[in-house]
UniProtKB/Swiss-Prot annotation:
Mode of membrane association: Single-pass membrane protein
Function: Required for cellulose biosynthesis.
Protein's cellular compartments: Cell inner membrane
Originating gene: bcsF
Gene Ontology CC annotation, any one: plasma membrane
Protein name listed in UniProt: Cellulose biosynthesis protein BcsF
Length: 63
């Protein structure tokens, strides 16, 4: 059976391990999240490569 002091010791032990690891990993977290997003997520809002065309109704004013 675990007592309250055992639970507090486990919480403090985890805090001593994971807070410094998170602080050290924060600069590379952006790179990791971008890499996983590019690997697993579908690209959105991407237009196919091609020439830029103007709509046929839009015409310049002749002066």
């Amino acid at each position: 059976m675990m007592t309250i002091s055992d639970i507090v010791q486990i919480i403090l032990f985890c805090a001593l391990i994971f807070f410094p690891l998170g602080y050290l990993a924060r600069h590379s977290l952006r790179r990791i999240s971008d890499t996983t997003r590019l690997l697993f997520a579908k690209p959105r809002y991407v237009k196919p490569a091609g020439t830029l065309r103007r709509a046929t109704k839009v015409k310049a004013d002749k002066k």
